[in-house]
Amino acid sequence: VIDSSKSTFIRSNKGEKLYGNLDFYSNLENSDGLSLTLDTNLQFKLFEELKTAISDSKALGGSALIMDSVSGEILAMVSYPSFNPNNSQRVIERNRVIEDFFEPGSLIKPITVAGALKLNLIKKDSVIDTNPGFINLSGFKRSEAGGKNFGKILPSEIISKSSQVGIAKISIKFSSEQMRNNLRLFGFGEYLNINWLNNNNGRMIDAPRLYDIDKASLGYGYSLTSNSLQLARAYSAFANEGVMIEPKLFINDETIRKRVLTKSNASFILDSLRMTILEGTASNLKNEEVEIAGKTGTSEKYIEGVGYASEKYISSFASIFPAQKPKFIMIVSIDEPDPNKYFGGDVSAPVVARMTKFMKRLKYL
């Protein structure tokens, strides 16, 4: 039952308070009552951990969610702050998980590799030459982060090391139609099938013909926008042997499934996401009690009418755990962390680490 008061909590179907500035849910109230999928313990703990991450990184705000990777049930969905800090006279309710659309950056790289495998544009053992650490596309130069040069690498390493040049070389193998169709297959640019949601499908470059720079941009998560629920939906395919699950907030809602990958290709991507933690861009999580598979994402923030803002980033981490037998998907996104420490592996990934410890202690894992 949803508490319809103006306090900052709702009640679960057990009558327990679910904290986290979530008056948003009061809009879902109906005369019959609703059985929400939200879990009291996870909702409260995730809200506290998100607040800590935002404070530690001196960020503007952020959001996080936990989804059951098998059923699609949203177990926790929090954002902070849920008001406009520039207007102290008026509290403006805002659920960033739903309302914040951003360019997801490198979180899209596994989707691009998965599509290339599906279309036989590459093989799992294809060698991609990323020398000399940059590539010229349609008159634009694109370089590896930090001036790195990964040399000759495999598709799995393109994911784990988050190679811009590697994913660009794969992306330009797609036709314009193939690139767009692959992203739509994984739900990007598509509405979520949630009846309570004031739906927005995000944006994607709509030029009939995509130049190489356009395809590369889409391949590494620019020129399209997504919210965290869409990302959780996409990553569920890697957790479920190629079957994508539609997120749901009401227990009685139907679980909607769609196969988007073969079991073999999904397993390959999941293993690549495990390597991101073992030896890649989120290696700070490799000694955690629960084995995590995941992908870091750090994108420059685009501001309408201004363009890409200097030293303003969206730092994200998409995770699947336990990596060997997935049960949960968690997406964390931090808005404008300190520009001196802004990578997703440093800012967002620690939230996942702390939550998995908490979930193991409480026997969720």
Q: What are the functions of these language-model segments?
A:
Residues V1-R11:
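Core domains of carbohydrate- and sulfate-ester-processing enzymes
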Residues L46, I158, V352:
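A helicase ATPase "motif cassette" and its flanking acidic/Ser/Thr-rich regulatory loops
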Residues D39, Q43, L231, G344-T356:
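Short, charged, low-complexity patches
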Residues P339-N340:
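Short beta-strands and strand-coil junctions in structured, solvent-facing domains, enriched
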Residues Y19-G62:
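Conserved, well-ordered alpha-helix/loop/beta-strand core segments that scaffold catalytic motifs
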Residues S12-D23, L38, A64-S106, I111-I334, ...:
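Beta-lactam-recognizing serine transpeptidase/beta-lactamase-like catalytic domain environment
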Residues R257, A349-L365:
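Short, gly/Ser/Thr-rich active-site loops of penicillin-recognizing serine hydrolases
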